[in-house]
Amino acid sequence: MLNIGIFGAPGSGKGTQSELISEKYSLYPISTGEILRREIKDKTELGKIAEEYINQGQLLPDYLTIRILVDLFDKVDNNKGYIFDGFPRTISQAKALDDLLKEQNTSIAIVFSLSVDEKELIRRLLKRGKLFSRKDDNLETIQNRLTVYREQTESVQEYYRKKGKLMEIIGKNSVEEVFENIVEKIDNLFR
């Protein structure tokens, strides 16, 4: 079973790369962001709670995010592995993910961190906001999301670095170049 994590600041391209990785390696994609947007659209109880946090540019509390993951693991019959898009975002979530995967006799093989400078992130997110009309892609919310990311998420890099599983990838290049770099790193795991 191959389990891969991919994270980076909002606008770093992790969703796009996650889709490409999922297709190439037949991994089940898990994007807590996508799950939450679906819950919000469907106006579920979880969706209403999540919407309040997202509209303020805040991360959901760990217990809610982990609940989403546990529910998903219970529903999905998967033996190839997972690609975790934007998860985990905190040390607590990383440890919970380790425990959940251990119950399935597997673990995270590699975690990619996409690095893009802040000006480029803001440019990408403002462009995306115009294209897709996402409420959370306005300048004030974007700046708050980037601050929250730096404060709460970057510690996860250190967690995986200490485990020898972190691979930093320059995310400013073309989608194709970034993907080629990622594929090379994954394939090197099996050589």
Swiss-Prot record:
Keywords: ATP-binding, Cytoplasm, Kinase, Nucleotide biosynthesis, Nucleotide-binding, Transferase. GO terms for cellular component: cytoplasm. One of its GO terms (molecular function) is ATP binding. It catalyses: AMP + ATP = 2 ADP. Catalyzes the reversible transfer of the terminal phosphate group between ATP and AMP. Plays an important role in cellular energy homeostasis and in adenine nucleotide metabolism. Belongs to the adenylate kinase family. This is Adenylate kinase. The lineage of its organism: Bacteria, Pseudomonadati, Bacteroidota, Bacteroidia, Bacteroidales.
